[in-house]
Structure formats: C-alpha cells, structure tokens
Amino acid sequence: MLRLLWTISFALLMLTSNIALSDTIGNVVKQKGNASVERAKNKLVLKKNSGIEFKDNVRTGDGDIGIKFVDNTNVAISPHSSLVIDDFVYDPNSKSGSKLVMNVALGTVRYASGNIAKLNAQNVDIRTPTARIGV
C-alpha cells in the first residue's frame, strides 16, 4: 500500500512539474530601452532572459527587444510596438500538432522562422491590423 501511495505521489509531482515548466515558451535574448509584458492583467518589466508565456502582450517603449521561442523562432520587436502571442504549441514530433499565431497589434516586428514553420509552414499565422501573413 505504501508503495502504491509513493508511486501516485511521484506521478502527481511529475505531472505538476511539467505543467509549471511548460508555461515559458520563449525568452528575451536582446533588450534595449523600455519593454514590458502584460500577463494576466499584470504589467511586468522585461529584461534579458525574462520568460515569455502563452497569451503575453509584449510592448516596447523607446527600445527594442528580441525573443527566441523554444522552437528556435526568433522575433525582433521594434520601438513603440505591441505583439500578442495568441497561440503557441510546439511538438517536434508532429507536423500538425505545432502552431504559432502572433498578432502584431502596433508597430514593426521582424520574424525568422523556427521549427514550427519547418515542420509545416501553414501552422504559422502572423496577423496585423490590416493584413494576415501565412508563412
């Protein structure tokens, strides 16, 4: 009985650990000037190595920022811009299971495709106020 309890406890610990680790989908690799993220109605200042999460709204002030996602997608956000990560799923073993949807709400963003686009370019969608770009 004790062994069963130990096994269940260990399984629950591993499950919750994976959930916590999966929140970060990328990191700030370059930061110059003011940049912040709106996350769950909180505004946080971004610095180099800050984590980026699903549904984040990344905003730049007078500076710019570079983000590298876990699939090796790189995004450079210019000053006075806003980028929302609407959807991000990365499964390196599935062409149809991965997806990246970004909304460039304001300003200029430079995108360099990573593994999601290499697996299936149709799974990348970049939206702007006036257009929609498929990779």
Regions found by a protein language model. Name each.
Residues M1-I8:
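Bacterial N-terminal signal peptides that target proteins for export
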Residues A20-D64, F69-G134:
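Flexible, surface-exposed loop/linker segments and immediately adjacent secondary-structure boundaries
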